[in-house]
């Protein structure tokens, strides 16, 4: 059925389907695939967390919570942020519990954007940022990170700013590059935000998973709490992707605006997941430590293996991705990923789906058992041998 | 004894999987293979890593199912040597898999493996309870091992994730 005018919104019509989708379709039908294409932990949620959720169901906590989420959970989030990242938010007015970091990003953008407002989106980045900016009526302006380690060049950021620019979106540690920004690099971005009076939307969902240096939050940079929207959640650090639980923190005025959008569009995050999140913050830390250690070992293994195979790979400070360059093969990211999948049944994600500067790279998730990583490396070695020029 | 972070890391990896190759250990800890070998030698020399073993599920091997019993043993400690002497007399028997000194209602916890309940019963009545300082024993037979030394015997290892995701 089709109306004469066409019934799809122009914005939605113009959104490109995610490049990840194609690889999902390709890989899904195959047997015996070793997947390095998964953007979520290979750990199951810690049992203590699952058990707390079951208990909440048994006790009948099955109704709505406050729009902003259980106060007890917001208080626990506030304590957690202060203790781990040295940032202070008032649980009563500056924290909203959301349906994943995904929804947090959505309500942040919808709360700040007017038609044609521009948002600088540092690429390569998580595939949702630009589409969510568009859906909120804004215009995403991609700014490419530097190929050498995928840090952000302050000059490039400055050059992209126009009178319509409203915010900069960053993600550290980053999906897909794993790159973590240190204090100095954050300060450079902060200086730009201050001089041009911009907000920073800081996606810190991987903050728990850092392996070399301690983590610095954008909101902890001097003078930045006032212009930062801090996005985070439970999916990655606590291995809780399927629960759909995240949160967003911002100064009161911004938070109250986001709460309006959240209240009308979502009501509240799932109650069972909120009880699970509470338990995760109270008693999940030991398991997070274990997972972090395990990821660190696998990161070291992957970085060393790729470099040994001749696919240059920087050692990322966080998340669970490595982003090796495949330029030496003479293949494009898409060709490499597709041929590797078909010939050796190893799924990776071509870097270009995360932005133009991801071309020439592939994202390999090491959220897989060490045996699987070993098998993947073995197959990639064989693939490279067969493709030697 | 104080270990460096990397030494500790190696201990932890091997405790989970003692078959991890030196090359993989090196890659996982960002050491060279020869540095890794040095660490291993040190850990072995110091008896920090005492032995490399496997966890076996004997219940799967016909004719070798065997039985395991945990025995609470009350003893009278001896002047001068405390519990150590009686512990030694007990742990030297090859049937004895573990001996722990416990706090609480009894003194030694002894784990015994044998071919049959009869064999274990015979050991307890003839060897263990006849030792001079042993006052009493209480034997518990293990009916099924679900988890042993941190390892679940029948884990659910199915990967429930979709193959490619953002
Ligand atoms: C950078 C980044 N932000 C946000 C998300 C979404 O997380 P959530 O599950 O909390 O919606 C992801 C998930 O892949 C991510 O990689």
Sequence positions of predicted segments:
Chain B
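A compositional/biophysical signature of low hydrophobicity enriched in polar/charged and small residues
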Residues: 1-166
């Amino acid at each position: 059925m089709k109306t004469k005018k066409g019934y799809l919104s122009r914005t939605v019509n113009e959104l490109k389907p995610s490049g990840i989708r194609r690889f999902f379709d390709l890989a899904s039908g195959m047997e015996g695939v070793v997947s390095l294409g998964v953007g979520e932990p290979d750990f199951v949620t810690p049992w203590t967390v699952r058990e707390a959720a079951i208990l909440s169901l048994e006790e009948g906590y099955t109704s709505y919570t406050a729009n902003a989420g259980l106060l007890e959970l917001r208080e626990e989030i506030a304590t957690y942020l202060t203790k781990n990242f040295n940032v202070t938010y008032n649980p009563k007015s500056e924290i909203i519990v959301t349906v994943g970091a995904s929804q947090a990003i959505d309500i942040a953008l919808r709360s700040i954007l007017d038609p044609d407002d521009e948002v600088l989106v540092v690429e390569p980045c998580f595939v949702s940022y630009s589409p969510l900016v568009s859906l909120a009526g804004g215009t995403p302006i991609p700014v490419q990170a530097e190929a050498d380690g995928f840090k952000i060049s302050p000059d490039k950021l400055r050059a992209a700013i126009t009178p319509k620019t409203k915010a900069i979106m960053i993600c550290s540690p980053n999906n897909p590059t794993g790159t973590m920004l240190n204090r100095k690099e954050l300060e450079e971005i902060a200086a730009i935000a201050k001089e041009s009076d911009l907000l920073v939307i800081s996606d810190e969902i991987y903050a728990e998973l850092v392996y070399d240096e301690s983590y610095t939050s954008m909101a902890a940079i001097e003078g930045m709490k006032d212009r930062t929207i801090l996005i985070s959640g439970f999916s990655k650090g606590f291995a809780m992707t399927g629960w759909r639980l995240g949160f967003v923190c911002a100064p009161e005025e911004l938070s109250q605006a986001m709460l309006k959008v959240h209240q009308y569009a979502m009501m509240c995050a799932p109650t069972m997941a909120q009880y699970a999140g509470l338990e995760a913050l109270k008693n999940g830390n030991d398991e997070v430590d274990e997972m972090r250690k395990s990821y660190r070992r696998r990161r070291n293994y992957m970085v060393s293996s790729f470099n040994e195979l001749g696919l240059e790979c920087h050692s990322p400070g966080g998340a669970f991705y490595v982003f090796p360059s495949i330029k030496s093969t003479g293949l494009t990211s898409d060709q490499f990923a597709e041929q590797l999948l078909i010939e050796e049944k190893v799924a990776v994600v071509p870097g270009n789906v995360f932005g133009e500067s991801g071309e020439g790279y592939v994202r390999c998730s090491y959220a897989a058992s060490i045996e699987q990583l070993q098998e993947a490396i073995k197959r990639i070695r064989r693939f490279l041998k067969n493709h030697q020029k | 004894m104080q270990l460096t972070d990397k030494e500790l890391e190696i201990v932890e990896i091997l405790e989970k999987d003692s078959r991890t190759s030196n090359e993989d250990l090196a890659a996982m800890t960002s050491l060279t293979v020869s540095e890794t070998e040095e660490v291993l030698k040190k850990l072995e020399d110091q008896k920090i890593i005492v032995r490399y073993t496997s966890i076996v599920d004997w219940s799967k091997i016909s004719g070798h199912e065997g039985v395991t019993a945990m025995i609470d043993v009350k003893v009278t400690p001896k002047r001068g040597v405390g519990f150590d002497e009686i512990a030694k007399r007990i742990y030297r028997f090859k049937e004895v898999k573990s001996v722990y000194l416990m706090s609480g209602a009894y003194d030694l916890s002894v784990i015994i493996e044998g071919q049959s309940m009869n064999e274990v019963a015979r050991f307890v009545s003839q060897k263990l309870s006849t030792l001079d300082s042993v006052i009493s024993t209480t034997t518990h037979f293990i009916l099924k091992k679900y988890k042993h030394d941190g390892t679940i015997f029948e884990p659910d290892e199915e990967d429930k994730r979709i193959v490619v995701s953002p």
